[in-house]
Amino acid sequence: MKRAPTKQPAKPAARGGERAQGRVIAAHGRHYIVAPADGGPMLQCFPRGKKSEVAVGDRVAYERTSADQGVIVEIGERRNLLYRSDQFKSKLFAANLDQLLIVLATEPYFSEDLLGRALIAAEANELKPIVVLNKIDVEAALPVARERLAPYRALGYDVLELSVKGAPDDARTQLAPRLAGHSTILLGQSGMGKSTLVNLLVPDAEAATREISAALNSGRHTTTFTRLYPLQDGGALIDSPGFQEFGLYHLTEGRLERAFPEFRPLLAHCRFYNCHHLHEPGCAILEALADGRIAPTRHALYAQLVHEASQIVR
């Protein structure tokens, strides 16, 4: 008879190796920075296992493996999770958000497609969207920018006009009350003034970025990771790298149609309950498009997003 294998004694816990709670404040690949809930020094953490589903803003449980490192063992329940996706993969932005702030500028020419997609993402995740039009001191480009944003104002979206560099005090006065006490993600194309806005609202942002970058071992690549900054008046600002595309392949057709506020009052009036709002007879959305109540650019965005959702590899 074989002897039962001798049970190996449990390895002693690493220094401070008990499970503790914290919040993810930065992410770069599979590297995460966690701020302990007890206020101790931040840690570089890695997810347990090969697959990583951790996002900035997550409340997590971690186990310390050394003085300044740990492993994330559990993700707390999320209120929401914002991410973008193409037909093959998804990229997490952040979790547990209240608001989405998208930064545009009079120049360079901003992408209306990206603006529309960001607003749809906000609506689909029940986030309050805030649109900032920066560089209003570039007066020659201001009328065109206002004209392009007029349809969004008409839909009820909050559009703030400011000049972060030209009138920083006014910019701070407009933004601070809207951000206080809320977790807000900041999105914007390169060149829109997003970094300047972060530095205005978070005076020590550059120092914090250098510290986090060093902890992530990301060296000079300081703009390639998402990070969270606590705000003086409560709440947090989450800065995500400048982006040039915003896929929403993961949104179902049902979620998409409800993410257009101008569609919602009409959805119950289509002739067919499973109307796709593309070519169907008796479609209330298409009737509103024909008589000018819905902008052609908005319906075109809806049609494009429905097409993208049909291409996803599940």
UniProtKB/Swiss-Prot annotation:
<dbReference type="GO" id="GO:0019843">
    <property type="term" value="F:rRNA binding"/>
</dbReference>
<dbReference type="InterPro" id="IPR010914">
    <property type="entry name" value="RsgA_GTPase_dom"/>
</dbReference>
<keyword id="KW-0699">rRNA-binding</keyword>
<feature type="domain" description="CP-type G">
    <location>
        <begin position="85"/>
        <end position="246"/>
    </location>
</feature>
<dbReference type="InterPro" id="IPR012340">
    <property type="entry name" value="NA-bd_OB-fold"/>
</dbReference>
<keyword id="KW-0342">GTP-binding</keyword>
<protein>
    <recommendedName>
        <fullName>Small ribosomal subunit biogenesis GTPase RsgA</fullName>
        <ecNumber>3.6.1.-</ecNumber>
    </recommendedName>
</protein>
<feature type="binding site">
    <location>
        <begin position="134"/>
        <end position="137"/>
    </location>
    <ligand>
        <name>GTP</name>
    </ligand>
</feature>
<feature type="binding site">
    <location>
        <begin position="188"/>
        <end position="196"/>
    </location>
    <ligand>
        <name>GTP</name>
    </ligand>
</feature>
<dbReference type="GO" id="GO:0005737">
    <property type="term" value="C:cytoplasm"/>
</dbReference>
<dbReference type="InterPro" id="IPR031944">
    <property type="entry name" value="RsgA_N"/>
</dbReference>
<keyword id="KW-0694">RNA-binding</keyword>
<keyword id="KW-0547">Nucleotide-binding</keyword>
<keyword id="KW-0479">Metal-binding</keyword>
<comment type="function">
    <text>One of several proteins that assist in the late maturation steps of the functional core of the 30S ribosomal subunit. Helps release RbfA from mature subunits. May play a role in the assembly of ribosomal proteins into the subunit. Circularly permuted GTPase that catalyzes slow GTP hydrolysis, GTPase activity is stimulated by the 30S ribosomal subunit.</text>
</comment>
<comment type="subunit">
    <text>Monomer. Associates with 30S ribosomal subunit, binds 16S rRNA.</text>
</comment>
<dbReference type="InterPro" id="IPR030378">
    <property type="entry name" value="G_CP_dom"/>
</dbReference>
<keyword id="KW-0862">Zinc</keyword>
<feature type="binding site">
    <location>
        <position position="275"/>
    </location>
    <ligand>
        <name>Zn(2+)</name>
    </ligand>
</feature>
<dbReference type="Pfam" id="PF03193">
    <property type="entry name" value="RsgA_GTPase"/>
</dbReference>
<feature type="region of interest" description="Disordered">
    <location>
        <begin position="1"/>
        <end position="21"/>
    </location>
</feature>
<keyword id="KW-0690">Ribosome biogenesis</keyword>
<feature type="binding site">
    <location>
        <position position="277"/>
    </location>
    <ligand>
        <name>Zn(2+)</name>
    </ligand>
</feature>
<dbReference type="GO" id="GO:0003924">
    <property type="term" value="F:GTPase activity"/>
</dbReference>
<comment type="similarity">
    <text>Belongs to the TRAFAC class YlqF/YawG GTPase family. RsgA subfamily.</text>
</comment>
<dbReference type="GO" id="GO:0005525">
    <property type="term" value="F:GTP binding"/>
</dbReference>
<dbReference type="InterPro" id="IPR004881">
    <property type="entry name" value="Ribosome_biogen_GTPase_RsgA"/>
</dbReference>
<keyword id="KW-0963">Cytoplasm</keyword>
<feature type="binding site">
    <location>
        <position position="270"/>
    </location>
    <ligand>
        <name>Zn(2+)</name>
    </ligand>
</feature>
<dbReference type="GO" id="GO:0046872">
    <property type="term" value="F:metal ion binding"/>
</dbReference>
<feature type="binding site">
    <location>
        <position position="283"/>
    </location>
    <ligand>
        <name>Zn(2+)</name>
    </ligand>
</feature>
<dbReference type="GO" id="GO:0042274">
    <property type="term" value="P:ribosomal small subunit biogenesis"/>
</dbReference>
<dbReference type="InterPro" id="IPR027417">
    <property type="entry name" value="P-loop_NTPase"/>
</dbReference>
<keyword id="KW-0378">Hydrolase</keyword>
